[in-house]
Amino acid sequence: KVWERCALARKLKELGMDGYRGVSLANWMCLTKWESDYNTDATNYNPSSESTDYGIFQINSRYWCNNGKTPHAVNGCGINCNVLLEDDITKAVQCAKRVVRDPQGVRAWVAWKNHCEGHDVEQYVEGCDL
C-alpha cells in the first residue's frame, strides 16, 4: 500500500509517533518519505550484509526481523519480516519504536541523516490538519 501523505501523518500520530523518543511527527514523515516513499511493500536487498530492508520504515533483517535467510540475524523486534509489509502499519510502528529506543536513535536510518537531519521538515506535515 502506498499511503497518501496526510493519511499516513494522521495514522502515525494516532499510533503515538509524534514526539516519540524526541522525534517529531514531521521527522518521521520525512524519514518514511525518503526510506520508502510511503510504500509498505518496499524491500531493498543489501548484498554486503546479505540483509534486506522491509516496509515503510525500511527495517533491516540483520537486526530487527526474521526472514529466514539473513546470516547472524538478531530479530530485535521478534517478528517475521513479512509483517513489516502489511497494509496495517501497527506492527511496523511498534518495531520502529524499538529501533529508535537504541542508543543511535533516529540516526539508525541513513535516509534520515541524509535528507532530514538539519533540514526544515515541516513540509512533510504541512496542510494535514493534525
Swiss-Prot record:
Family listed: Belongs to the glycosyl hydrolase 22 family.
Function: Lysozymes have primarily a bacteriolytic function; those in tissues and body fluids are associated with the monocyte-macrophage system and enhance the activity of immunoagents.
Intrachain disulfide bonds: C6-C128, C30-C116, C65-C81, C77-C95
GO molecular function: lysozyme activity
Keyword Ribonucleoprotein: no
Database matches in Pfam families: Lys
Hydrolase keyword on record: yes
CDD domains: LYZ_C
UniProt-listed Enzyme Commission number(s): 3.2.1.17
Gene3D superfamilies named in the record: 1.10.530.10
Record keywords: Antimicrobial, Bacteriolytic enzyme, Digestion, Disulfide bond, Glycosidase, Hydrolase
Residues in C-type lysozyme domain copies: 1-130
Recorded superkingdom: Eukaryota
Gene that encodes the chain: LYZ
Reaction(s) catalysed (UniProt annotation): Hydrolysis of (1->4)-beta-linkages between N-acetylmuramic acid and N-acetyl-D-glucosamine residues in a peptidoglycan and between N-acetyl-D-glucosamine residues in chitodextrins
Assembly: Monomer.
PANTHER family: LYSOZYME C (PTHR11407:SF28)
GO biological process: defense response to Gram-negative bacterium; defense response to Gram-positive bacterium; digestion; killing of cells of another organism
Active-site residues, Swiss-Prot/TrEMBL: E35, D53
Protein name: Lysozyme C
Leftover remarks: Lysozyme C is capable of both hydrolysis and transglycosylation; it also shows a slight esterase activity. It acts rapidly on both peptide-substituted and unsubstituted peptidoglycan, and slowly on chitin oligosaccharides.
Organism: Camelus dromedarius
InterPro entries referenced in this protein's UniProt entry, alphabetically: Glyco_hydro_22 (IPR001916), Glyco_hydro_22_CS (IPR019799), Glyco_hydro_22_lys (IPR000974), Lysozyme-like_dom_sf (IPR023346)
